[in-house]
């Protein structure tokens, strides 16, 4: 059979649903840029902050090289998930 469940995903798109969500991130300045499905860019202080946002807000994103980053905000788009 072709589909044995071990195929790796083709895209780099990620969303994190691990529980509990990371609540505290290290105070490390290692900026990462991501792009969401609306082609909006976000610049986060570090990868942990991206994962925290992804987990808490259901934020789906793709990592983008810094030189291609057109980020206008560094805030997590919390409003994407209605609680």
UniProtKB/Swiss-Prot annotation:
Thermostable. No decrease in activity was observed after heating for 1 hour at up to 95 degrees Celsius. No decrease in activity observed after incubating at pH 2.5, pH 7.4 and at pH 11.0 for 1 hour to overnight. Signal peptide: none annotated. The keyword rRNA processing does not apply. The keyword Zinc-finger does not apply. Serine protease inhibitor. Inhibits porcine pancreatic elastase with a Ki of 58.3 nM, human neutrophil elastase with a Ki of 3.6 nM, cathepsin G with a Ki of 153.5 nM, chymotrypsin with a Ki of 26.7 nM and subtilisin with a Ki of 0.68 nM. Does not inhibit neutrophil protease 3 or pancreatic trypsin. This is Greglin. The lineage of its organism: Eukaryota, Metazoa, Ecdysozoa, Arthropoda, Hexapoda.
């Amino acid at each position: 059979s072709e589909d044995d469940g071990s195929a790796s995903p083709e895209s780099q798109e990620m969303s994190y649903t691990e529980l509990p969500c990371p609540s505290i991130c290290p105070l490390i300045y290692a900026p990462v840029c991501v792009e969401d499905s609306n082609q909006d860019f976000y610049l986060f202080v570090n990868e942990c902050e991206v994962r925290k946002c992804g987990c808490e807000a259901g934020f789906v994103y793709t990592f983008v090289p810094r030189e291609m980053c057109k980020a206008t905000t560094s805030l997590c788009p919390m409003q994407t998930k209605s609680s």
